[in-house]
């Protein structure tokens, strides 16, 4: 690529191709995890979206001969409003880069630009779990982010109340934070599965006995990842003393490794969170992602040029996220804390 002779329009075409290729290379792990229900928000429809849960009875009622059938009871659950945020980043291709043919530096800048918005989205969605034991945190831009569910409690909590937004639900409480926060092991996995069996209710206080949990999520910690793989992929009981012992966990869950799970609000490493893990139900998720603006590229024709003679390119995107309730996910910090 001879930068010293290329026109701005030709360079923009090349920049767009490089940007799209870089963007397409991202795995978008959290967005594609199945844990978030994604909605494309139409333009000119406001900057907020409200989500809620509605539950029916789990069981039918008796109907005697000649009697009218009883109507199912509909219960409004909690509500959660998400608000759009706009993410942006610009780069400048300087006149020196163009005139002196610094192609590698230019390619590096364009490649980086293609990843910035989607990387921030992945971090924001990851921090739903990273800060799942907190009610709020301050992000890298200094903004306060509410980490609560619709009941104003942290996502992972010991006593979520099922009364609902209109307080017409049940006085039953449930927990989705595993007691004593054990590290991933056979015993702790069975403990968290007990939360599924005994602590998963609808807003009528009825046990949801058949809610399928299909994801085992962890961070990238090698020991935790390897432990998860041993349980999910062994053909025999990993803790069994005899060969040929059946492994009850084989193919029971899809293992979701979340690369940015053990991070600070600024995206730096946070070893205090390296052992976080849990399970989740994708089909019953109440986590929502609204996309107001898909990630797009701005060119010098749109951003303009300045007295530095730089050609300016920018990435933009807008989205919002939030969780209505914690019923679909169970978690442990893995640090042994009470």
Regions found by a protein language model. Give the residues of each.
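N-terminal alpha-helical "arm" segments
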Residues: 1-29
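Sequence/fold signature of self-assembling virion shell proteins
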Residues: 2-8, 149-205, 209-214, 220-338
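Generic detector of short, locally flexible boundary/turn motifs and exposed helical patches
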Residues: 14-15, 53-59, 78-80, 174-183, ...
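Assembly/oligomerization interface modules of large self-assembling protein complexes
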Residues: 27-87
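Short, surface-exposed, charged/polar-biased interaction segments
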Residues: 32, 47, 112, 127, ...
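Short active-site-adjacent helix-start/loop capping segments
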Residues: 57-63, 99-101, 306, 318
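Long, contiguous amphipathic alpha-helices that act as assembly "spine/axial" helices in icosahedral shell
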Residues: 78-136, 213-216, 313-315
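Glycine-rich, mobile lid/loop segments that gate access to catalytic sites or pores
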Residues: 121-170
């Amino acid at each position: 690529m001879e930068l010293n002779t290329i026109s701005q329009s030709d360079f923009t075409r090349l920049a767009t191709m490089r940007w799209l290729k870089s963007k397409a290379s991202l795995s978008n792990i959290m967005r594609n995890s199945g844990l978030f229900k994604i909605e494309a928000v139409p333009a000119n429809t406001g900057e907020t979206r409200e989500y809620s849960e509605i539950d029916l009875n789990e069981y039918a009622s008796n109907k005697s001969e000649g009697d009218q059938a009883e109507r199912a009871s509909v219960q409004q659950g909690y509500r959660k409003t998400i608000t759009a945020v706009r993410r942006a980043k610009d780069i400048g291709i300087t006149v020196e880069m163009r005139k002196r043919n610094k192609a590698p530096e230019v390619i590096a800048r364009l490649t980086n630009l293609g990843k910035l918005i989607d990387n921030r989205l992945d971090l924001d969605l990851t921090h739903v779990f990273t800060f799942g034991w907190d009610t709020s945190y301050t992000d890298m831009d200094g903004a306060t982010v509410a980490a609560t569910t619709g009941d104003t409690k942290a996502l992972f909590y010991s006593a979520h109340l099922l009364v609902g937004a209109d307080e017409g639900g049940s006085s039953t409480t449930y927990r989705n934070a595993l007691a004593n926060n054990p590290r991933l092991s056979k015993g702790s996995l069975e403990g968290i599965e007990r939360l599924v069996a005994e602590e998963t209710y609808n807003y009528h206080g009825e046990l949801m006995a058949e809610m399928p949990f299909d994801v085992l999520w962890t961070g990238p910690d090698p020991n935790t990842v390897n432990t998860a793989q041993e349980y999910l992929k062994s053909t025999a009981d990993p803790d069994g003393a005899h060969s040929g012992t059946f492994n009850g966990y084989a193919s029971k869950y899809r293992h979701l490794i979340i690369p940015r799970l053990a991070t600070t609000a600024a995206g730096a490493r946070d070893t205090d969170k390296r052992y976080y893990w849990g399970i989740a139900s994708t089909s019953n998720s109440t986590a929502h992602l609204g996309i107001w603006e898909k990630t797009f590229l701005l060119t010098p024709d749109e951003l303009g040029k300045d007295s530095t003679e730089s050609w300016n390119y920018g990435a933009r995107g807008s989205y919002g996220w939030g969780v209505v309730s914690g019923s679909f996910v169970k978690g442990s910090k893995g640090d042994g804390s009470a």
